[in-house]
Amino acid sequence: MNEKDLKLMVEQLVSQMVGQVDMQSVEKVVKEVSKNQSQVESDEFIPDITEIDIKKQLLVDNPADREAYLEMKAKTPARLGSGRAGARYKTITALRMRADHAAAQDSVFSDVSEEFIKKNNFIPVKTMCTDKDEYVTRPDLGRRFSPETTEIIKEKCDKNPKVQIMVGDGLSSAAIEANVEDILPSIEQGLKMYGLNVGPILFVKYCRVPAMDAVGEATGADVVCLLVGERPGLVTAESMSAYIAYKPKVGMPEAKRTVISNIHKGGTTAVEAGAHIAELIKTMLDKKASGIDLK
């Protein structure tokens, strides 16, 4: 039987099947399905799988030692015990991976809201980047300010303060909105115990870490502390870092900075980090050094 004969046979079978179908029954079923589709169940919802704590989620079928497996998972956010469906990941594992990746992408390409900036009384400024694409592809522009912006910084901030705090969106706007409101009161309270006051706080859009050097030069601050969003990953999109330097200058070595990283609810909490930052700032002022010079 050649291809032409096979095609003819299939066409005949399809024609016979169509002829046996009751079209009235088909129309009735279609109307019923359409009617049901238009009805929305108000009490139904799609659960957010990103809210599941993967440290407590074991997807291996019939594990030999469930308790030991969960004990191991509790010590790491790694995706252990994800199970298999044949040779592949289970659907929930694949969906969670895509959801976490999407959250990471969103945190990079979204902006800190204007309402958040106004609510916290930040002084908004911007580096020389014009948009997110340029920020990602031109790191050098995220380190510098225009002459006009530099003048705004000089005008709005205290002159020659002991401490200048600044907030930068960095690579995660989600990290800033999730942590800043908890960490700032902790820093301010800690510094107050040492007799240090915090002046106006800058918010820098399209901020790279060395932008703090330009702020240090513009304000003449003894210590500059930058709270900035870290590059997100699949574990969390809300991790923030604090970069602190004594008398930072443009072009200074990276080794002169002290950094506290992994500030988020699953790492170092914002309140705990704030207390540590205040202590570090006091140490820098006493020893007139930062980074490896503190060692």
Curated annotation (Swiss-Prot):
It comes from the Bacteria. It is found in: Bacterial microcompartment. Its cofactor is adenosylcob(III)alamin. Its EC number is 4.3.1.7. Binds between the large and small subunits. One of its GO terms (biological process) is ethanolamine catabolic process. It catalyses: ethanolamine = acetaldehyde + NH4(+). Pathway: Amine and polyamine degradation; ethanolamine degradation. Transmembrane segments: none annotated. InterPro entries: EutC, EutC_C, EutC_N. Gene3D superfamilies: Ethanolamine ammonia-lyase light chain (EutC) (3.40.50.11240), Ethanolamine ammonia-lyase light chain (EutC), N-terminal domain (1.10.30.40). NCBIfam families: PRK05465.1 (NF003971). Belongs to the EutC family. This is Ethanolamine ammonia-lyase small subunit. It comes from Clostridium perfringens (strain 13 / Type A). The lineage of its organism: Bacteria, Bacillati, Bacillota, Clostridia, Eubacteriales.
